[in-house]
Amino acid sequence: EDTENWINDKFSKLPEIAKANIKALKTGYNFGITVEAFHHTYVVEKAALPAGEYTNINGNIGLSWGLIAAAKKANLDLFYGSYPITPASDILHELSKHKNFNVITFQAEDEIAAAAASVGASFTGKLAVTGTSGPGLALKSETISLALSAELPLVIVNVQRGGPSTGLPTKPEQSDLMFALYGRHGESPLPVVAAKSPSHAFYAAYEASRIALKYMTPVILLSDNYVATGSEPWNLPNTCLLYTSPSPRDIG
């Protein structure tokens, strides 16, 4: 029914084309049910989801929206500095679509410059975020330590992929936890938040931002290739119920 509605809407000015497409759709659907080429057939039942308004998201989109929500709650502009790297690049692409929410995106010449620009944005009062994957996190480690010693809020997104070294851009892996916890020189502990699903990526990004702003510290947000590119229906939250993210200007 939803597909038929989409076809009718798509070809509203060409009803004959819409009719032909619906006929082809039903023919293919009925063929799959009646053909005797398969020993077993099954029907995928409709998912038993709680009532609500849903949209389909992947982890990178959910994470991006969580950052935007945190910035709006804190009444801050959002700055995202990044260098393209699979599978984190789509966060830059998604955030660049939302300039109307006072989102500033910056594609730097390398990973170190992206992190340094984000530290500068944090110093000027933005909710500053930099994103990368495993090898990029290694390059950013000195700048992360700088933000820590300067007590500047900064969210570092690490969408993990197969490693070590440059690794395998399209292979899912969750092998950067120890590096996220301890991969900096000197005594430089910081919080680490991890997303477990595409929809949870929204809340993980929001929480990482809240912690960074409240405690004036860098926070590493871990995702991975599977979460980033996997998708699921997401029940849109009531943003009024989200914790308020404090602004640095509110912290004495």
Per-segment meaning from a language model:
Residues 22-36, 190-242:
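Structural signature of the thiamine diphosphate
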Residues 125-127, 208, 250:
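Intrinsically disordered, low-complexity serine/threonine-rich segments
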Residues 243-252:
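Single conserved hydrophobic/aromatic residue that forms the stacking wall/gate
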Residues 110-111, 224, 250:
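Acidic active-site catalytic centers that drive phospho-/nucleotidyl reactions
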Residues 85, 227, 250:
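Short, glycine/acidic-enriched loop or turn micro-motifs at the edges of active sites
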